[in-house]
Amino acid sequence: MTLSKKIYNYLYIFFLVLIIVISEFSTNFAKAKTFVINDIEIQEKYDLNFNKIKVVDKAFKKAFEILISKILQSENKNILRSTDINQIKSFVEGFSLMEEKFVDDNYQAKINVDFNKKDLINYFNSKGIITSSINSIDVMILPILIDLKKNQIFSYSNNPFFLNWNLNNKKFHQINYFLPNEDIEDFSIIRKNIDDIENYNFNEIFNKYNVKNRILLVLLNQDNLIKVFSKLNLENNEMYLNKNYKDVSMKNLEQINDVILDLKNDYENKWKSLNEINTSIILPIRLSVDANNFLLSNNLENYLNEVDLISNY
């Protein structure tokens, strides 16, 4: 083996090791060339005006809206809702139609859509928008509702936020929640620490479930004003959130659900902030590979295509 070829091989190995090390400690790394949105349900009246291309275009639009809700902060996704269908179609890498059927003169189907990840990231970056990787996470949430007037803690079975939390899920949500079981001991721990509830960690409750990712949600209700304090611990990152909600009745399920969805969106934004793919900082690296070694070149190219942190090569 010649000296120059040895150097090329050493550089190649060094470069791959560098990428692997960076990727191992970064939430920005993803091993996929596409963003995949599955099981988009479509339905259209089947009559003389039926046009399958237009139906699929609607599915692309719907899939795109779900995607941007998954990977963009709330304030940014509204900017892109007006993206025209031709622009959206330019990002589509492929799609598959499933379960096509006709029911009562209606065409129904499910569609999976693959969007080109690098094209989308570059498009968003050109608009000054940072994307996040799609990374689902299981989180235990402990919603504690307190009536300040009565100095009363609601049991889980009487807490509308507890009862309705998992009834308000959206397809773009990446956080999968689970709640504790009704337990007299939990209630006793909460009541014991009611005077310092925003500072107490409630590890006695969380540790029973052996959970790493957790959210403490404290809701203080007085005269239809709800003061909310949230302490999030996601992948060893501690974050806090304080909000107020006015004119929320504990008897109005629609208002309760609106608060739940708003909080879930805030938690999604916090989680996305930990998974940002920031390619705005450009660090040029020169790498030489033997063009005659097709297998080596092909493997390297495939690997580079899969790394979000590499914008161009």
Describe these PLM feature segments.
Residues 1-8:
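N-terminal secretory signal peptides that target proteins for export/translocation
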Residues 78-144, 151-156:
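Signal peptide-directed extracytoplasmic domains
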Residues 53-70, 112, 119-134, 171-174, ...:
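C-terminal/domain-edge helix-coil "capping" segments
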Residues 33-39, 117, 210-255:
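Amphipathic beta-strand/beta-sheet edge segments enriched in Tyr/Trp
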Residues 40, 45, 114-120, 144-148, ...:
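Solvent-exposed coil/turn segments that connect beta secondary-structure elements
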Residues 56-79, 137-198, 207-214, 300-313:
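N-terminal segment of the mature soluble domain
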Residues 12-24:
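Bacterial N-terminal signal peptides
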Residues 29-47:
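Short N-terminal segments immediately surrounding and downstream of signal-peptide cleavage
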